[in-house]
Regions:
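Beta-sandwich/jelly-roll carbohydrate-recognition scaffolds of carbohydrate-active enzymes
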Residues: 2-200
Length: 200
């Protein structure tokens, strides 16, 4: 029997010095707990294939051509080749400048640095040659896959959607997905999108 779980060495590791996530070589976020690393998982497919994931990759391709961290950073860069073109995906957990200089933090036990976690997973896509059909599936599963998520559009168009827990929504974080493309939302189904990336 073929093991549905990739080797742990195949996962990319991202961190914003407050949180972490693991991304499989197939372009899927398979471990992320929010808002803290000791919170229940939102994406947990590394442990259970039905426990939530967030995949962003070319349609019909599951093995990238190359993968690396940009030098001196925790920005993961994945290069994909298809029969119609080349695509580069860059991913990072974002840090921003320290935002509150007037009051002490209620979440930090140590004196804060100049930078702080923004709690944003940023995934950028750039088509460098030809045209590539891209697929995105975002299927969170709150509380280690014990609570389903429901999606709804939260912006004026189709580029922003929010996922909330179906039961006891206040006890779980809300996830906001923003894209420059159009996302398909169907309440209890995952957010999906297939777009053709234009030429460079």
């Amino acid at each position: 029997l073929r093991n549905p779980f990739p080797p742990i060495a195949d996962y990319g590791f991202l961190s914003d010095c407050e949180n972490t996530c693991l991304i499989s070589s197939s372009g899927s976020v398979e471990w992320l707990c929010v808002p803290r690393p000791d919170s229940p998982s939102v994406f947990g497919a590394i442990l259970d294939r039905g426990a939530g994931h967030f995949r962003l990759a070319p349609y019909g391709v599951s093995v990238p051509s190359a993968r690396r961290y940009l030098p001196g950073s925790l920005i993961l860069e994945t290069t994909w080749q298809t029969h119609t073109g080349w695509l580069i995906v860059r991913e990072a957990l974002v840090m921003g400048p320290w935002h509150d200089l007037e009051a002490r933090s209620r979440t930090h036990r140590r004196t804060p640095m100049d930078w702080d976690a923004e709690h944003i997973l940023l995934r950028t896509v750039r088509c460098v040659s030809g045209t590539v059909e891209l697929t995105m599936t975002c299927q969170p599963a709150f509380d280690y896959h014990r609570v389903r998520a429901a999606w709804e559009y939260s912006g004026p168009a189709y580029g922003e959607a929010t996922a909330r827990a179906v039961t006891d929504a206040d006890a779980h974080p809300a996830l906001r997905l923003t894209t420059s493309g159009r996302s398909g939302v169907s309440s209890l189904l995952p957010v999906t999108s297939r777009v053709a990336s234009a030429s460079p």
